[in-house]
């Protein structure tokens, strides 16, 4: 089923890309599921040019992040900068305030200011083709960070978490918490995913729906709003406010009469926060299961207080460490370590990739995963306790 889904996503998204340019972002093709190809290997990059690298330690690395508005990108950038500097590199770290022209300008400046390699978390996967042509002309390798850059043959490697697995873990959590294989049902669920210009959003949603769709088809899960297709449930810029506004409308139309809402699939924490805000203001029934991703601090607090059921934890220290390893290998004239050479096609060919494995956090294990590991300090959470009536 996963092969069929990912192939369908690629075909659909590539068609949208050709018709809409910088509109909805393209999907990726999987001739072999990512989780079936996790043995780390060293693979040649899609392009053979390495003239822009140096065989000695040191050099200047450009790191382009999309925004500081989401906590996770702050942590990604900070972790990356610290580890690259520790490895002996000069770092040009830039945030673009979710503005595409700003990010394009920042990358252009990195290219012209002597950066020998680029690590880019794109705002929109289809928006960087022209500026990356400049990088290609100067033989500057490019690592797409967490978000695949589409339709550019300048992309050398891709580093991310297993985004399909993120979605399946969210779907499995809902399945298990509602005991869908044994309970009579039906249960009401609503669906909220991410930005249509973010390639990962289709993977998150696709993975979750591979788990949940059979129960929807069987009538055990019911989407009362009727909103189930990706374009309808997508949330521009992963905006908390947009997710909240849409959830306000869904509650008003479908749950204001006391109808029970059992679960809300949210692909990440910023959308989950919007859904939570809406429920607090408008919903009077038993609190539903709410999923998320990124373990942002406000959402961890909501998990502890019973307002959010779980969040996928993607330890950015792990991803940053792997990217530094990849950068170091290429800068020394070698090949970056990868563990997937079949899944991520950006429209110009398969991009050699390294996929880190995500885990999920909830009220039972957040302390071990987030605090005991040093990812967060306990100061912000010590005054909160889990309610005895929580469903999580």
Q: How does the language model describe each region?
A:
Residues 5, 18, 22-384, 390-392:
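A residue-level marker of the well-folded mature domains of exported/periplasmic proteins
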Residues 11-17:
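Bacterial N-terminal signal peptides
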């Amino acid at each position: 089923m996963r092969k069929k889904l990912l192939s369908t996503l690629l075909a659909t998204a590539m068609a949208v890309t050709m018709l809409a340019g910088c509109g909805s972002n393209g999907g990726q093709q999987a001739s072999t599921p990512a989780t079936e190809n996790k043995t780390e290997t060293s693979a040649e990059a899609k392009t053979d040019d390495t003239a822009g690298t140096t065989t000695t330690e040191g050099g200047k690395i450009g790191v382009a992040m999309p925004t500081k508005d989401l906590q996770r990108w702050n942590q990604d950038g900070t972790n990356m900068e610290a580890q690259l500097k520790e490895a002996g590199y000069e770092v040009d770290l830039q945030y673009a305030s979710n503005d595409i022209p700003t990010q394009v300008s920042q990358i252009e400046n990195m290219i012209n200011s002597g950066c020998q390699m680029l690590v880019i978390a794109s705002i929109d996967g289809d928006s960087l083709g022209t500026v990356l042509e400049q990088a290609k002309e100067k033989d500057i390798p490019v690592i797409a960070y967490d978000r695949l850059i589409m339709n550019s043959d300048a992309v050398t490697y891709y580093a991310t978490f297993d985004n399909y697995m993120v979605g399946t873990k969210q779907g499995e959590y809902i399945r298990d918490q509602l005991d869908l294989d044994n309970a009579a049902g039906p249960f009401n669920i609503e669906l909220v995913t991410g930005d249509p210009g973010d390639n990962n959003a289709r993977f998150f949603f696709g993975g979750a729906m591979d788990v949940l769709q059979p129960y929807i088809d069987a009538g055990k899960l019911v989407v009362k709003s009727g909103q189930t297709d990706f374009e309808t449930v997508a949330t521009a810029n992963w905006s908390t406010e947009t997710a909240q506004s849409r959830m306000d409308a869904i509650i008003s139309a479908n749950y204001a009469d006391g109808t029970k809402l059992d679960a809300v699939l949210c692909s990440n924490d910023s959308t989950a926060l919007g859904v939570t805000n809406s429920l607090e203001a408008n919903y009077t029934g038993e609190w539903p299961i709410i999923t998320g991703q990124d373990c942002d601090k406000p959402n961890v607090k909501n998990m502890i207080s019973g307002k959010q059921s779980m969040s996928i934890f993607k330890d950015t220290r792990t991803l940053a460490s792997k990217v530094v390893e990849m950068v170091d290998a290429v800068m020394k004239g070698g090949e970056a370590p990868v563990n997937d050479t079949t899944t991520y096609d950006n429209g110009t060919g398969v991009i050699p990739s390294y996929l880190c494995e995500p885990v999920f956090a909830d009220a039972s294990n957040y302390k071990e995963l987030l605090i005991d590991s040093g990812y967060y300090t306990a100061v912000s959470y010590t005054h909160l306790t889990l309610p005895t009536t929580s469903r999580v």
